[in-house]
A protein has these predicted regions:
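Conserved SAM-binding loop
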Residues: 161
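Membrane-anchoring alpha-helices and their flanking helix-loop junctions
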Residues: 1-158, 167-230
């Protein structure tokens, strides 16, 4: 097995175990197993692992391996935003589960739960995975990967917006609150979305300055996240 594939498998196992640990914590906070929104969210995470193993690992093992590496040239602003994202995600899930257990929001219509499920599924299992399949340079923190001949990607979802992976993650965070039935969880969910918008703006700015061909690509694909809006 090539070293990159071995490293990619380790990364995928780590991510999958982390997701399973998160799922266990969710049900632990809620305090019961007969909670279908929790199982629906679990299915979204499990499906992501399956799709990553089936469609990303065979074509981009080096990209997955790269996501596990720490580089000295990682930007401090990016690491700070990643930390804020982690805190917001932890608050979002904890608040949602406490809300379900203690009944702060109260029952929501089934359509609200299903709408949240659709947003989370489209964002995480479709748009994010599609972005990773298309972009061999889709790594966890911003850096120009000169050692891998980093180049502009303009196919797939990148033909419509310049940062489709961030759009997918924003949809996931906004959808989770509705799926789990917690309006209180929308507060950290919107904070996570705001952090991703800031990260998009900063990353887009440095890509213009540092990645050859990106300015020409940005002139062709005008929208950073949402066509017709921004």
């Amino acid at each position: 097995m090539p070293p990159s594939t071995s490293s990619a498998l380790r990364w995928l196992r780590r991510e999958t175990l982390g997701n399973l640990f998160l799922i266990a914590i969710l049900f632990g906070i809620v305090g019961r197993w007969d909670w279908w929104p929790g199982w629906a969210l679990s299915a979204i995470y499990i499906l992501w692992s399956v799709l990553t193993a089936a469609f990303i690992l065979p074509v981009h093992p080096e990209m997955l391996a790269e996501r596990a590496r720490i580089h000295p040239d990682q930007r401090k602003w990016d690491l700070t935003l990643l930390w804020l994202m982690g805190v917001a995600m932890l608050l979002e899930y904890t608040l949602a589960c406490l809300d379900v257990r203690l009944g702060w929001t109260g029952p929501l219509p089934l359509g609200v739960h299903l709408g949240g499920l659709a947003l989370a599924f489209i964002g995480y299992d479709l748009l994010l995975v599609w972005s990773m399949v298309t972009n061999a340079f889709f790594v966890a923190t911003y850096r120009i990967q000169s050692e891998r001949q980093h180049a502009v990607v303009s196919s797939g979802p990148y033909h419509r917006v310049r940062h489709p992976g961030y759009l997918g993650t924003i949809l996931m965070h906004l959808g989770v609150s509705f799926l789990l039935g917690s309006l209180w969880a929308l507060i950290p969910g919107m904070l996570a979305a705001a952090v991703l918008v800031i990260r998009t703006a900063l990353e887009d700015k440095v890509l213009h300055a540092e990645l050859p061909g990106y300015s020409d690509y940005a002139a062709r694909v005008r929208w950073r996240l949402l066509p017709g809006v921004w």
